[in-house]
Amino acid sequence: MATNDQSAPETTVSVAEDGNNSPKDGYDKKCIFCKIVNKEMGTELLHSDEEISCFRDIKPGAPHHYLVVPSKHVGNCKSLGKDHIPLVERMVEMGKEILQKNNITDLEDVRFGFHWPPFCSVSHLHLHVLAPVSQMGFISRQFYRLNSYWFITAEQLIQRLNSLG
């Protein structure tokens, strides 16, 4: 069992009882997205910097389906606070940049959003960037449906975070 050593310096990486690195250090070794960002999976990173990374969704719901994730482990959208608004905004901007690099200029035919817990398959914050929405199939339209209790747009998430005390 791990003990909490009060004399340990603040720079010590905390390790959970099962030996996993704590998400406090920015990496969860059981998280597939942490592995992708750290280039352990062979997934092509379309963008990667200290703050955010972007790669293609493994099961695309639209001709262009990208995931934008924080480069350090951050829990799902339900765990966010008001201080995460700039991160979410930066994730949306990166999604727009990736779409533009792929010649998607009609931003009226795109969707930016998150699955709301418990309907997210990976509990590392990830923004779905889908385009063109008009070419999404029936199942994808349901899976990424606006005004559903399982999917929230980036704009709705920012409004929700702004309303927190």
What are these regions (language model features)?
Residues 1-165:
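HIT superfamily nucleotide-processing domains
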